[in-house]
UniProtKB/Swiss-Prot annotation:
Function per UniProt: Inhibitor of neuronal axonal outgrowth. Acts as a negative regulator of CDC42 and STAT3 and a positive regulator of STMN2. Positive regulator of CDC27.
Organism per entry: Homo sapiens
Glycosylation sites: 46
Tissues expressing the protein: Expressed in the brain, within neuronal axonal fibers and associated with myelin sheets (at protein level). Expression tends to be lower in the brain of Alzheimer disease patients compared to healthy individuals (at protein level).
The keyword Glycoprotein belongs to this UniProt entry's keyword annotation: yes
Residue spans crossing the bilayer: 19-42, 143-164
Modified residues (N-acetylmethionine): 1
Matches recorded under Pfam families: TCRP1
Protein name per UniProt: Myelin-associated neurite-outgrowth inhibitor
Amino acid sequence: MNPVYSPGSSGVPYANAKGIGYPAGFPMGYAAAAPAYSPNMYPGANPTFQTGYTPGTPYKVSCSPTSGAVPPYSSSPNPYQTAVYPVRSAYPQQSPYAQQGTYYTQPLYAAPPHVIHHTTVVQPNGMPATVYPAPIPPPRGNGVTMGMVAGTTMAMSAGTLLTAHSPTPVAPHPVTVPTYRAPGTPTYSYVPPQW
């Protein structure tokens, strides 16, 4: 144990050996005993919030304990407006700005927190999120050999293929090859000037 620090036993007033001045109201000693613990913070009966309920009555809490009146009827089943909480829909976004049929669009949704830097406001993404182009299926062959008529066999169409007139061959196209610069030292410098 630290010999310099030797705490006094509880309940013993602090001996002010050095005569240090304390501000007004500072206790010069410990209280004799702590006040007894009371489980009820507010003593007495509270008529608004009963601690129990009468046996035999249906157990329910009134919507407004003070008056007992029922809150006014709302025709909307959802107390929150739809625009406050954007929900991702399973259907494409029905937006007048999106080209229907050409693009698949995602519904408008609030940006996730990692997108919004150093702000506390949920900022929607403005446009109906990413616009995906409609997928174009790759062309697939119909399984018919080139030159054959569908529904025939090779034996039936081979005679027509062999005797069919072949077009006259096309003359080779003249190709001009540009003249390239002769290899050697370039006329410009790769190193920028050092000022």
